Curated annotation (Swiss-Prot):
Its main location: Golgi. The lineage of its organism: Eukaryota, Amoebozoa, Evosea, Eumycetozoa, Dictyostelia. It is a multi-pass membrane protein. It comes from the Eukaryota. This is Protein YIPF1 homolog. Residues 1-166, 229-232, 277-296 are cytoplasmic. It is found in: Golgi apparatus, cis-Golgi network membrane; Golgi apparatus, trans-Golgi network membrane; Late endosome membrane. The gene is yipf1. One of its GO terms (biological process) is vesicle-mediated transport. Belongs to the YIP1 family. InterPro entries: Yip1_dom, Yip5/YIPF1/YIPF2. GO terms for molecular function: small GTPase binding. Pfam families: Yip1. Residues 188-207, 254-255, 318-347 are lumenal. Residues 1-115 are annotated as: Disordered.
Length: 347
């Protein structure tokens, strides 16, 4: 039995056969639209699009399979022997500070005084890198040489510095000694001054100390180097400057101890420092002389010892003196004038 719309049946005809109107009424549309209040969505468009989405079949998704790569494969590998050597050097440097370095300019295998192509760099005497080899030492080497300078026997200092003599240690030893001697000298004058208020610092002591110490440490090695060169010995000027610079290291603590205002203590300190440093200097210089020039070597070493003792006496008698000279100015008006006396001759 077909469905009929009985909306208009109140006209008395029960067989009214008007087809059913399947379109929604205005009231139904209003109710459906109320599902989306305060929006711009149209219910008809929403239902139509939803139906189309349900009718669409899902897209075909193929069964993807991924190929696994082995971890042992190096995609950037190069079979050349140079690259293999570079890789080995990078692995060796991985444990060092800074890690691996891809720049060969800073590699440990490249010397500092060479170019990138392996040729030796050339510097002029007025350029700072020209004197770099004079300071090519570290703290450990300098400390070892300072300790050895206070042990005058059982080793050769020239053998220790033969491969790498330096001027770094001697420069700081001499410079420190210049200022310490000047300060100690002024303190001795202050302690033994009768009037501390009128006492003033003597800046000239720094100049005198520099002339004495630098002159002794540069002039005498230069003269000895000329003599040894004339005797065809293998001692270089740099070796002589190095040993004379380290020789005076023991005078640094000795000068500090000379602040003690006791003459006997100061004499003992200066004597010990001069004997230890003098033996260190004489024994090391006499070693290359004793084989072929025994008599000359004894004379040269005697002169070296005498000059070293002279330096110690200058330090003690001039810089570490315990007394200051007090000059008094006499007033000529207060001095009495001599009165003539009558003398008679006895006949």
């Amino acid at each position: 039995m077909s469905n009929y719309n009985n909306k208009h049946h109140d006209d008395g005809n029960p067989f009214y056969n008007e087809p059913i109107n399947t379109s929604p009424t205005q009231q139904q549309q209003q109710q459906q639209q109320n599902l989306f209040p305060n929006t711009n969505i149209d219910y008809n468009d929403y239902t139509q699009n939803r139906g189309q989405q349900q009718q669409q079949q899902p897209a075909y998704q193929p069964d993807l399979q991924f190929q696994s790569f082995s971890h042992d494969v190096d995609v950037n590998s190069n079979t050349s022997p140079n690259n293999n050597n570079n890789n080995n050097s990078n692995n060796n440097n991985s444990n060092k500070i800074g890690g691996n370095s891809s720049n060969n300019k800073f590699s440990d295998n490249v010397p500092l005084n060479t170019n990138e192509d392996g040729t030796e760099k050339k510097y002029s005497f007025y350029e700072v890198p020209y004197y770099r080899f004079l300071f090519n030492v570290d703290t450990k080497e300098v400390g070892l040489r300072l300790i050895r300078s206070m042990l005058p026997i059982k080793f050769s200092f020239f053998n220790l510095i033969r491969e790498n003599p330096d001027l770094y240690g001697p420069f700081w030893v001499l410079t420190s000694l210049v200022f310490i001697v000047a300060v100690t000298s002024n303190l001795n004058e202050y302690f033994h001054s009768s009037d501390h208020k009128s006492w003033e610092v003597d800046i000239q002591k720094i100049v005198y100390s520099a002339i004495t110490i630098y002159g002794y440490s540069f002039v005498i090695p230069l003269i000895l180097w000329g003599i040894f060169k004339w005797m065809n010995l293998g001692l270089r000027l740099l070796d002589m400057l190095c040993i004379y610079g380290y020789t005076l290291f023991i005078f640094v603590p000795a000068s500090i101890l000379c602040v003690i205002p006791l003459q006997l203590v100061q004499w003992i300190i200066v004597a010990i420092a001069s004997i230890v440093s003098g033996l260190f200097l004489v024994t090391n210089i006499f070693t290359p002389l004793k084989e072929d020039f025994t008599k000359r070597g004894l004379i040269i070493c005697a002169v070296i010892g005498a000059l070293h003792i002279g330096l110690a006496l200058v330090l003690k008698l001039y810089f570490f003196a315990n007394s200051t000279e007090n000059f008094t100015i006499s007033d000529s008006s207060s001095t009495p004038t001599p009165t003539p006396t009558n003398t008679t001759k006895l006949l």
